[in-house]
């Protein structure tokens, strides 16, 4: 099909479990915000969106198996709705895997020759470099579940920006914590401390949603 799911996920109906430590693992340490930013601390732009979308997709596909996957880059490019998934999209995916590895989110085992499919192993989403394990939901290991509709509906269309995708995740977490689920708020005064994201990202994300 158009998204390449015929090759794909074995966790139908389960969505992607994302630890709340991805938002803030310690005061001042925000893995999602750092993933959205360039390594020099600048805005992540389109690259930030691709990194976040690809990591979420890997969690969806690989979190329930041995936490690794051996799928061609074109599969991921189709899953993310990239143009020209067999060529340009695939190159973008491969360069993004390399960036995610440098940042401590994945391990890449490259094939024996140029053009061979790499094995991608998911690591802990806090970017600690620790092996991935399925979150338990117990104290200290809480998580949100990203609905598979993100990929199947799909919600993850080209119109969704990096800030929009980040705010989508923040909304899922806020909804889970809210007492009044009919009216969610994202106060500017606490937003940066909680998520490490700028006021500009908050505004752009809310507008995009």
Regions found by a protein language model. Name each.
Residues 18, 23-44, 144-157:
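Short, Lys/Arg-enriched N-terminal segment that forms or immediately precedes the first helix
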Residues 40-45, 86-90, 154-161, 192-199:
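Short, charged/polar micro-motifs that form catalytic or ligand-binding hotspots
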Residues 24-28, 46-51, 68-72, 143, ...:
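Helix-boundary capping/turn motifs
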Residues 138-146, 170-185:
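A short mid-domain helix/strand-loop element embedded in enzyme catalytic domains
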Residues 45-66, 159-179:
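Detector for short helical micro-motifs
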Residues 60-118, 176-209:
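Winged helix-turn-helix DNA-binding recognition segment
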Residues 122-159:
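Short, amphipathic alpha-helical interaction segments positioned at domain boundaries
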Residues 1-16:
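Generic N-terminal amphipathic/basic segments
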């Amino acid at each position: 099909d158009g998204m390449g799911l015929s090759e794909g996920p074995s966790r139908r109906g389960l969505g992607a479990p994302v630890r709340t430590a991805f938002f803030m693992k310690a005061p001042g340490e925000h893995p999602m915000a750092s993933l959205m930013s360039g390594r020099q601390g600048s805005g992540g732009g389109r690259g930030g969106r691709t990194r976040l979308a690809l990591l979420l997709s890997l969690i969806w596909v690989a979190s329930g198996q041995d936490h690794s996957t051996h799928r061609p880059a074109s599969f991921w490019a189709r899953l993310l709705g990239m143009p020209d998934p067999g060529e340009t999209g695939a190159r973008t995916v491969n360069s993004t895997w390399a960036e995610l590895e440098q940042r401590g989110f994945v391990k890449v085992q490259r094939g024996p020759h140029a053009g061979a499919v790499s094995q991608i192993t998911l690591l802990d989403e806090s970017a600690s470099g620790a092996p991935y394990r399925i979150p338990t939901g117990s104290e200290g290991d809480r998580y949100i579940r990203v609905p598979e509709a993100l990929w199947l509906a799909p919600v993850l269309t080209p119109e969704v920006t990096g800030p929009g995708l980040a705010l989508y995740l923040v909304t899922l977490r806020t909804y889970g914590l809210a007492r009044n689920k009919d009216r969610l708020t994202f106060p500017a005064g606490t937003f940066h401390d909680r998520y490490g994201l700028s006021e500009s990202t908050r505004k752009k994300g809310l507008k995009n949603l």
